[in-house]
Swiss-Prot record:
Transmembrane segments: none annotated. The gene is Gdap2. This is Ganglioside-induced differentiation-associated protein 2. Induction: By differentiation in neurons. Keywords: Phosphoprotein. GO terms for biological process: response to retinoic acid. Pfam families: CRAL_TRIO_2, Macro. The keyword Phosphoprotein applies.
Length: 498
């Protein structure tokens, strides 16, 4: 606490000049306004908005000094990173912050977690973990960084926060190019304020002297302060400006779905792209599965010459598109909170690693329809490239087990791309019962999977295919493996800093 009568070291965000008020180039822009409106075709996807600009602040200073509802701390997955932002926050917040962080048990890349602000002027601290950057895996890094900003803002919205102070989430030691990262930061915040920002009054970008120039350069692209600045900035926008939420988009991953489900099938077929799909690695029995009809009957029709293979593929494709459309519109936050399915690093061949935690799937307690939709929502953009699945069967019980009838139905529903690009399934800590069940399932139901299943009795075996630094292990998996196979893994952290 400051001595009585001494000036406070903290800065109230309401005293800071907004981005919109900082514009001095054109005091009277009536002529340019008229001119810009005449050139409708030249409008930017990030149009001039006085309201949005009034909510944004660029401030050179320490984010820990901001007096706002919440500030953002960038850290590593164990929330113990030593960087200037974190060290300042910890110093000013006091020792209670470290105790509170221990209860969180880490934070995965792209996630956001909340603690109190303690001795800070800010009521809360939102902790997030930015990605490490490697040009080879640029798309994954972009998606993770987007998730950082998006999840911070989503948390602020859910907690009814009126003001948020952002540090620069990408840290220099993680190698993310500042300008590339700033594009993602600005467009994500812009899109969120447009769509969900009705209750957010201030978003402050707290930057260092080195970072300020980049933000000054790029802010006009996403937050133009006049119509003239909007038009002037348009040629400098990058080709990839993300989707409607600002999320990075890879062109070959985009699909077109009819906005009118009742439209004729001819029109629907014209609107669909090839190569959408899902794999069998998750859960749920859904009424949508019946949209496709009886698959065995369809196969009989094929044999009888009554239904061509091409016609069946089109019908199958339409069915998956309905699943995907529903997955994108449904609120799946309750399923996401289970942390049963998530993306981690890459295997030794550079393929994306997806993790399924069997113990986190309470089959008898959750809405299996929504679980399947969540699987599609997560996997749709993953399965366009080669990937592997790591399934932790560790310490599962009967109510975590999926029956073979459902898995067979799910396998029949998914698209060929998901099956083709799935290169391996690592079944970690199997039991005798699970090995027998898997053998029967892959022998008599889905023979195409049989050669891809690898039973892994210890984590040491898994490391021959995937480096331990590339997997985010649930703590109970590490504890079980150390108990059953020896404590050789003790040198690896439970939440590797990917």
């Amino acid at each position: 606490m400051d001595p009585l009568g001494a000036p406070s070291q903290f800065v109230d965000v309401d005293t800071l000049l907004s981005w919109g008020d900082s514009y001095e180039d054109e005091v009277d822009c009536a002529d340019s306004t008229a001119e810009a409106f005449q050139e409708d075709a030249s409008r930017s996807p990030f149009v001039y908005s006085r309201d949005v600009n009034g909510k944004v602040v660029l401030w050179k200073g320490d984010v820990a000094l901001l007096n706002c509802t919440a500030i953002v701390n960038t850290s590593n997955e164990s929330l113990t990173d030593k960087n200037p932002v974190s060290e300042s926050i910890f110093m000013l917040a006091g020792p209670d912050l470290k105790e509170d962080l221990q209860k969180l048990k880490g934070c995965r890349t792209g996630e956001a977690k909340l603690t109190k602000g303690f001795n800070l002027a800010a009521r809360f601290i939102i902790h997030t973990v930015g990605p490490k950057y490697k040009s080879r895996y640029r798309t994954a890094a972009e998606s993770s960084l987007y998730s950082c900003y998006r999840n911070v803002l989503q948390l602020a919205k859910e907690q009814s926060m009126s003001s948020v102070g952002f540090c620069v989430i990408n840290s220099a030691k993680r190698g993310y190019p500042l300008e590339d990262a700033t594009h993602i930061a600005l467009r994500t915040v812009r899109r969120f304020l447009e769509i969900h920002g009705e209750n957010i009054e201030k978003v402050v970008f707290a930057v260092s002297e080195l970072e300020e120039a980049t933000y000054q350069k790029l802010l006009p692209l996403y937050f133009p302060r006049s119509l003239k600045e909007e038009i002037r900035s348009l040629p400098y926008l990058p080709a990839d400006i993300g989707n409607a939420e600002g999320e990075p988009v890879v062109p070959e991953r985009q699909i077109r779905i009819s906005e009118k489900p009742g439209a004729s099938e001819d029109n629907e077929e014209e609107d669909e792209d090839e190569g959408l799909g899902v794999d069998l690695s998750f859960i749920g029995s859904h009424a949508f599965a019946r949209m496709e009809g009886d698959i065995d009957k369809q196969r009989k029709l094929i044999l009888q010459g009554q239904l061509s293979e091409a016609a069946l593929q089109k019908q199958h494709q339409r069915n998956y598109n309905r699943w995907l459309c529903q997955a994108r519109s449904e609120d799946l936050s309750d399923i996401a909170s289970l942390k049963a399915l998530y993306q981690t690093g890459v295997d030794n061949c550079g393929r994306t690693v997806m993790v399924v935690v069997g113990r986190n799937i309470p089959v008898t307690l959750i809405d299996m329809d929504k679980a399947l939709l969540y699987f599609i929502h997560v996997m749709d953009h993953i399965a366009v490239k080669e990937y592997v699945l790591v399934y932790f069967h560790t310490l599962t019980s009967d109510y975590n087990h999926l029956d073979s009838d459902f898995l067979k139905k799910l396998y029949d529903v998914v698209d060929i791309k998901y099956k083709r690009n799935l290169k391996a399934v690592y079944f970690v800590h199997p039991t005798f019962r699970s090995k027998v069940s898997t053998w029967f399932f892959t022998t008599f139901s889905v023979s195409g999977l049989k050669d891809k299943i690898h039973h892994v009795d210890s984590l040491q075996q898994l490391f021959s295919a995937i480096s331990p630094e590339q997997i985010d292990f649930p703590p109970f998996v590490l504890e079980y493996d150390a108990r059953e196979n020896g404590p050789y893994f003790a040198s690896y952290p439970p939440s590797p800093d990917l």
